[in-house]
């Protein structure tokens, strides 16, 4: 099995595949955005439910999501609370009706990656390099039975001002297309902007978490006037509000408690930060089913080909609910690895 991609989705796929007895080669040129994932969604409160989580995700996506994928993600996310010792503090991301964003020291992405890599040490063959569509075609031609999982992330790295590493340019899309997979929603209208991204200094391109708007933070327009009448906007709506009020804003953290800023690993001396919306997540990509099989233009399974994480389409609709990027990577990474490994077992039994 070959897994292309070294973020959370790729490593979760590797762990699931290894647990099913598969031999795995993981090829990547970095961890993508995964180390920067602060939190993920998991319905752990008694007043929450899978159904409410599904509804929030569909509402945030303007009901353009693939409901089957949404239901799978929300249902399977419940198992994450048995895998990780989340902090007791829950966050309500913009667009959610109840708090369900959980983390470990506000660094779930980096911590989960480190834990998975430690568990898989010596069990996965790891190569750091870029994989091209031409190379994958040659591999498939020499071994038609090889299983391939694409977990290469999105394409927002192609923008000059972005939260993404510059190597995230959509390579996985070309690989899927070359192998017969269908693509959906790979256009500018399916790029989600992170509303509050640092514009200046050495931290340019680094987001400032929007959940602080619930905890005393304010957004000021270029003239220093507060312009938000409702902090319950989702990220898409918040980005539009900033664009309509001068194109950038000052994130005023003056009234956020010091302890809260320390928890977020923020400089207490930096109380007003110049921010602007920046491309953050690509919402379209490779078409998959709930078992992460890649589908062709006719909706048929492309045998032996799987995809998971931000490289896929359908989960988020027209707007990703805050916290769902990490959840989707975790859930569908595991599904892709397990299903690919089970297909290997099935091939051997025939």
For each feature predicted by the language model, list its residue ranges.
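Beta1/beta-strand and adjacent pyrophosphate-binding region of the FAD-binding site
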Residues: 1-9, 25
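Conserved Rossmann-like nucleotide-cofactor binding loop
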Residues: 9, 32, 225
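Glycine-rich active-site loop/strand segments that organize a redox cofactor
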Residues: 41-73
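Conserved redox-cofactor binding core of oxidoreductases
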Residues: 77-147, 151-159, 196-198
């Amino acid at each position: 099995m070959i897994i292309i991609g070294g973020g959370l989705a790729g490593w979760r796929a590797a762990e699931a595949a290894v647990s099913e007895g598969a031999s795995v080669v993981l090829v990547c040129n970095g961890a993508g955005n995964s180390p920067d994932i602060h939190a993920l969604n998991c319905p752990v409160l008694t007043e929450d439910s899978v159904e409410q989580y599904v509804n929030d995700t569909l509402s945030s996506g303007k009901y353009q999501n693939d409901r089957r994928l949404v239901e799978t993600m929300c249902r399977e996310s419940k198992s994450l609370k048995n895998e990780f010792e989340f902090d007791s503090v829950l966050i309500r991301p913009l667009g959610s009706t109840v708090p369900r964003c959980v983390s470990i020291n506000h660094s779930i992405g980096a911590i989960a990656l480190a834990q998975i890599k430690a568990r898989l040490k010596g069990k996965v063959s790891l190569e750091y390099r870029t994989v091209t569509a031409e190379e994958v075609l040659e591999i498939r031609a020499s071994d038609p039975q090889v299983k391939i999982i694409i977990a290469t992330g999105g394409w927002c790295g192609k923008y000059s001002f972005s939260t993404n590493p510059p190597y995230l340019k959509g390579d996985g899309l070309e690989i899927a297309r070359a192998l017969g997979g269908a693509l959906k929603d790979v256009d500018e209208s399916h790029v989600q902007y992170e509303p509050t991204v640092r514009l200046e200094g050495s931290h340019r391109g680094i987001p400032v978490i929007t959940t602080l708007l619930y905890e005393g933070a304010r957004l000021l327009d270029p003239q220093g006037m507060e312009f938000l009448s409702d902090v319950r906007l989702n990220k898409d709506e918040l980005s539009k509000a900033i664009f309509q009020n001068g194109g950038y804003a000052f994130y005023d953290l003056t009234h956020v408690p010091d302890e809260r800023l320390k928890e977020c690993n923020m400089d207490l001396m930096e109380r007003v930060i110049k921010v602007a919306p920046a491309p953050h997540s690509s919402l379209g990509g490779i078409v998959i089913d709930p078992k992460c099989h890649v589908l062709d233009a006719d909706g048929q399974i492309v045998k032996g080909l799987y995809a998971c994480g931000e490289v896929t389409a359908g989960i988020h609709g027209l707007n990703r609910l805050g916290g769902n990027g990490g959840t989707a990577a975790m859930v569908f990474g595991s599904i892709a690895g397990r299903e690919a490994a089970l297909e290997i077992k099935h091939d051997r039994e025939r």
